[in-house]
Amino acid sequence: MTSADYASRQRAIIAELNVAPHFDAEAEIDRRIDFLAQYLRSTGLRTYVLGISGGVDSSTAGRLAQLSVERLRADGYDARFIAMRLPNGVQNDEEDAQRALAFVRADEVLTVDVKPAADAMLRSLVASGHAFDTPAQQDFVHGNIKARERMIAQYAVAGARRGIVIGTDHAAESLMGFFTKFGDGGADILPLAGLNKRRVRGVARALGGEELIVMKVPTADLEELRPLRPDEHAYGVTYDEIDDFLEGKPVADRVYETVLRFYDGSRHKRALPYTMFDWPAA
């Protein structure tokens, strides 16, 4: 591809992911709190539910959710926010998760250990006669099972409490497809959409998040053979490079190539299930 081709695709992706050319953290906070509040009221439901991992994304989305239900209550609408801790046994960075909960200040906190369910599913797969190619493949699949068990737990609570599940996907993760389909990608509303990682951190900082939260190294921490593996190691590019791409800045050819490879390979994650009427795309 030529430089012009790269730039053309970059502009199209930025538009698709709704990344604005300018960023004002305080304005984004108010806009996103208002969005959450108006949406919940429009549904007639009463509760937001979100899993809090300890990272900046869930911390930021959680604080926005709490402020949105407080705004609704001040306006006479009964609403509340439930933060869920969803560890897989003992979380490696539990101290960070507790710090995040203190920042979010949710109305209610529920803790559900997904390890028994995730491990039982893996055992059932193995007992069925299914054989994994390698231990690494089994570990990867097991990690996605954990993410989907977390989704199940959040929807169980939402279903019982007239609730809506919040997701933490933002433009950088959406671009790279770095979420589990029907796992952490399974949600009803995405208050961080349109923000790249740099801007999520800017919102978190403006909300009063301490630097240990704002600058925590992003990790899905789903794989037991590679605990706390940073997202950037999986990408092969840094968040700064991804964010520069999303802000329309020129990046190195290797960054263009890596980003576009991840973006094209994860297109199905950003779409509703395909039918014969919409695939292949015209």
Curated annotation (Swiss-Prot):
This is NH(3)-dependent NAD(+) synthetase. CDD domains: NAD_synthase. Catalyzes the ATP-dependent amidation of deamido-NAD to form NAD. Uses ammonia as a nitrogen source. Homodimer. It comes from Burkholderia cenocepacia (strain ATCC BAA-245 / DSM 16553 / LMG 16656 / NCTC 13227 / J2315 / CF5610). Keywords: ATP-binding, Ligase, Magnesium, Metal-binding, NAD, Nucleotide-binding. GO terms for molecular function: ATP binding; glutaminase activity; metal ion binding; NAD+ synthase (glutamine-hydrolyzing) activity; NAD+ synthase activity. It catalyses: deamido-NAD(+) + NH4(+) + ATP = AMP + diphosphate + NAD(+) + H(+).
